[in-house]
Amino acid sequence: MLRQILSDMFIDPDLLAELSEEQKQILFYKMREEQIRRWKEREAAMERKESLPVKSRPKKENGKSVHWKLGADKQVWVWVMGEHHLDKPYDVLCDEILAEREHLRAAKDSELRKTQSLELANSLKIKSQNCDLQAMKKTEPQNVTRKAASEEASGQGPRAIPTRKDDKAQTKPVKEKDHEEMKQTEDEKTKQIYKSWKEDSEWQASLRKSKAADEKRRSLAKQAREDYKRLSQRGRSGDGLQNPLTGPQKPRRPPLPPKPQFLQPLGIPPKSLGNQGVIRTEISSAQMDTIRWFKEEQLPFRAGYQKNSDTIAPWFHGILTLKKANELLSTGVPGSFLIRVSEKIKGYALSYLSEEGCKHFLIDASANSYSFLGVDQLQHATLADLVEYHKEEPITSLGKELLLYPCGQQDKLPDYLELFQ
């Protein structure tokens, strides 16, 4: 099943929904490995193609070309953000970008206000100058005559007229003061806007969520790699396991087991399962295909049986929905589990009750062995071997899921009857 997913580079959304978070991360890790492998193959093919002699094309006049910068290893120089010790953290870069944006916005607003105020002042100044000129033209001859007459009568000479330099000397401190006030106002507004950005609760919440999500993804990916290595090492020396590096060895089919002894729910006496007029529900074509697959390919490998007897294991169930599996486990305690036949793949689904709730893991049985989807290092010969192994070894390192308490049948008739009749 895993090989099929990696070949198509696609997984059905319904199938993906049944995977646990750990299995999803491992599957994505394997798909990424497959992408890299295909990319390397294409690169090697391109290099072989480029090494062949090619007719040189005539160069165009003033032709433009791109040359990549090469590093010390003669490969294309690449800089990965965040790996160098001098690189700034992500949140610091965000703060600097926001501060720069607000500074530019405040400067632009200040420049606009300054331009508008200058235009207004110039227009008022021009109007006042026009009015003064008109008034001076009317009164200047009279004032000059009157002033000259008064000066001659008093015997004093004409007084010096104030020059334009004196006016500039008086207005210069005023302009400098206005400029300082405007600059101070601009700085205060920039600080205020930046502070409001920093204190914005939604922005802070989204930043925290993104950091937490990144940290969780890194942790899950790291844990998946560690599980990958740990299980591969254990798989080399485990009993009842197959090493995928040498390929799954197809076991010889044993003879068909005898008619199973069905486990009855507690408090209900055993009854003959002959022709009792059992009411059957309509079975879909997908269920019929699953039943046929189980009878033809799984019964010879004692799927659903206890390890050392001809009795159906208490943890084994038939074709159950996700909702029904959750209902059965809801009456149990953490550590309870069941294995049900899956309609999505040629395999099974292990439903497990943890402290946080129900978890579901897909078991691939397409290669005549049993392993969790995504973790293809440990391939068990039977379902019972898989259960026995994970009674002591947790399914995932993060969840520490140990198969402690099998969840049995709760109805009068077991839900796996159709698989064995």
Swiss-Prot record:
Cellular component GO terms, alphabetically?
cytoplasm; cytosol
Chief localization class?
Answer: cytoplasm
| Compartment(s) | Cytoplasm
Database matches in Pfam families:
SH2
Q: Give the SUPFAM superfamilies listed for this entry.
A: SH2 domain (SSF55550)
Which ranges are annotated Basic and acidic residues under compositional bias?
A: 163-201, 211-230
**Keywords recorded for this protein, A-Z:** Cytoplasm, Phosphoprotein, SH2 domain
Tissue-specific expression: In the kidney, expressed only in the glomerulus. Expressed in T-cells, B-cells, macrophages and dendritic cells (at protein level). In adult, highest levels are found in muscle and lung with lower levels in kidney.
An MF annotation (GO) of this entry = phosphatase binding
Q: Which residues carry this modification: Phosphoserine?
A: S117, S123, S232
Region feature Disordered, mapped onto this chain: 132-271
What is known about its induction?
A: Upon CD3/CD28 stimulation in CD4 T-cells.
Domain spans labelled SH2: 315-407
Q: Which Gene3D superfamilies match?
A: SH2 domain
Query: Which purpose does this protein serve, as stated in its record?
Result: Inhibits estrogen-induced cell proliferation by competing with PLCG for binding to ESR1, blocking the effect of estrogen on PLCG and repressing estrogen-induced proliferation. May play a role in T-cell development and function.
Q: Which PANTHER family match?
A: SH2 DOMAIN-CONTAINING PROTEIN 4A, T CELL-SPECIFIC ADAPTER PROTEIN TSAD
- Quaternary structure and partners: Interacts with ESR1.
- Please state what the protein is called: SH2 domain-containing protein 4A
Q: Which organism is it from?
A: Mus musculus (Mouse)
